[in-house]
Design a protein with these regions (language model features):
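Short coil/turn segments at beta-strand junctions that form active-site/ligand-binding loops
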Residues: 1-2, 79-82, 109
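Class I S-adenosyl-L-methionine
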Residues: 36-85, 89-98, 104-105
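Mixed-charge interfacial surface used for oligomerization/domain docking
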Residues: 3-4, 10-31, 35, 91, ...
Length: 179
């Protein structure tokens, strides 16, 4: 069965890996003041941080259900029968919910959605490893979710921030938490 993988850009899949493997990365919407961008498509990380340093207020939004559904439908038209979708943590974003809603709107393709419960490059590395193992035949489809859980327990991500200003400006902290 032809299988494809999907994730959102917050999971930071290596661009070279993305271009050479059966994975589609759906960009997160990035808003800086009144301008809207697609993460890593219409704005680079360097440009994003430059604009924040210059005082623009950032916020992000999960990919729209319609955009996710379009990806699922395009993969189905390419003959894909199974899709594994990795979502940034449902505790941090509505992306998981959007993946589920899109799944409910399409028939004829099996979709497994995995809530990574994390964010950042370490998740991307785990996904890349899973795809390599699956593509070489060493990882059966039925074991993908368990393999992700196994890999995710092999690392911890510690995040430090220079200032909490951007977390507040992006809506991740309330005013009381910020002060």
């Amino acid at each position: 069965m032809k299988t494809a993988f999907v994730c959102d850009s917050a999971l930071q899949i290596n661009k070279n890996f993305e271009n050479n493997n059966p994975i589609t990365v759906i960009p997160v919407e990035v808003r800086l003041d009144d301008e809207i961008f697609e993460d890593n498509v219409t704005i680079t990380p360097d440009e994003f941080y430059k604009r924040i340093h210059n005082g623009q207020k950032p916020s992000t939004s999960q990919p729209a259900v319609g955009k996710i559904l379009s990806v699922y439908e395009e993969l189905k038209q390419q003959g894909v029968e199974r899709i594994v979708a990795f979502s940034v943590s449902s505790k941090l974003s509505g992306t998981y919910s959007s993946f589920v809603q899109a799944k409910e709107l399409i028939d004829g393709v099996e979709i497994k959605i995995i809530d990574t419960l994390q964010i950042a490059r370490m998740v991307g590395i785990a996904i890349e490893k899973i795809i390599k193992e699956f593509e070489t035949g060493s990882l059966p489809f039925e074991n993908i979710e368990n393999r992700y859980l196994e890999l995710s327990q092999q690392h911890n991500v510690l995040v430090t921030v220079e200032t909490m200003q951007y977390l507040y400006a992006g809506g991740r902290l309330t005013k009381a938490q910020f002060v």
